[in-house]
Amino acid sequence: MERIKLAEKIISTCREMNASGLNQGTSGNVSARYTGGMLITPSGIAYSKMTPDMIVFVDDKGKPEAGKIPSSEWLIHLACYKARPELNAVIHTHAVNSTAVAIHNHSIPAIHYMVAVSGTDHIPCIPYYTFGSPELADGVSKGIRESKSLLMQHHGMLAMDVTLEKTLWLAGETETLADLYIKCGGLHHDVPVLSEAEMTIVLEKFKTYGLKA
């Protein structure tokens, strides 16, 4: 895809993310794999004012193009692309329910078969590290190898998939599951979960399930 077209899709994803309630203000960030690196949202610019020329290219060694400042979380995005070469888009948000669960350092267990959208039988929560730090990038790298969506303790949520559209869908499903987990009382006591055997069946069925385009 041409750079300008991909940059436009990144911006439209950001705006849809905020409009749907998955994020607030400029706290989240979005990227897409691009030849030799990635395109990522810039630091501190409102999505309503963002234009394609503001989207920043960062090469696969972590060097941003001259004159532009990428999101403060560019390290976690780059770590994701290195960890999952088959996936092409990353969305990080401070979605309220996902963040609430993450503050308690809870993973989301198999409370509903839709947990399988993550590619595994739970949605993990990685330990807290300072935002923008190499330690956080390392934690995200380990977590994303296990699951396509994850929670970040005292921070937020991250999702990764093959396209921006699928990644936004995955982020939305993760937030819904976090909401269900809270409403089931999962922050304060054990909740019923599906068996490992059932989740194995569901995961197999999910190989052909989900957003098709």
UniProtKB/Swiss-Prot annotation:
Its EC number is 4.1.2.62. Disruption phenotype: Inactivation of the gene precludes growth of the strain with 5-deoxyribose. Its cofactor is Co(2+). Binds 1 cobalt ion per subunit. Can also use Mn(2+). It is an enzyme of class 4 (lyase). It comes from Escherichia coli O45:K1 (strain S88 / ExPEC). It holds the Pfam family Aldolase_II. Co(2+) binds at E73, H92, H94, H155. The record marks Y113, F131, Y209 as: Plays a key role in the stabilization of the transition state and positioning the aldehyde component. One of its GO terms (biological process) is L-methionine salvage from methylthioadenosine. PANTHER family: 3-OXO-TETRONATE 4-PHOSPHATE DECARBOXYLASE-RELATED (PTHR22789:SF0), FUCULOSE PHOSPHATE ALDOLASE (PTHR22789). It comes from the Bacteria. Belongs to the aldolase class II family. One of its GO terms (molecular function) is aldehyde-lyase activity. Uses 5-methylthioribulose-1-phosphate to yield 2-(methylthio)acetaldehyde and dihydroxyacetone phosphate. Can also use 5-deoxyribulose 1-phosphate to yield acetaldehyde and dihydroxyacetone phosphate. Part of a bifunctional DHAP-shunt salvage pathway for SAM by-products. Pathway: Amino-acid biosynthesis; L-methionine biosynthesis via salvage pathway. The lineage of its organism: Bacteria, Pseudomonadati, Pseudomonadota, Gammaproteobacteria, Enterobacterales. This is 5-methylthioribulose-1-phosphate/5-deoxyribulose-1-phosphate aldolase. The active site is at E73. One of its GO terms (cellular component) is cytosol. Keywords: Amino-acid biosynthesis, Cobalt, Lyase, Metal-binding, Methionine biosynthesis. It catalyses: 5-(methylsulfanyl)-D-ribulose 1-phosphate = 2-(methylsulfanyl)acetaldehyde + dihydroxyacetone phosphate; 5-deoxy-D-ribulose 1-phosphate = dihydroxyacetone phosphate + acetaldehyde.
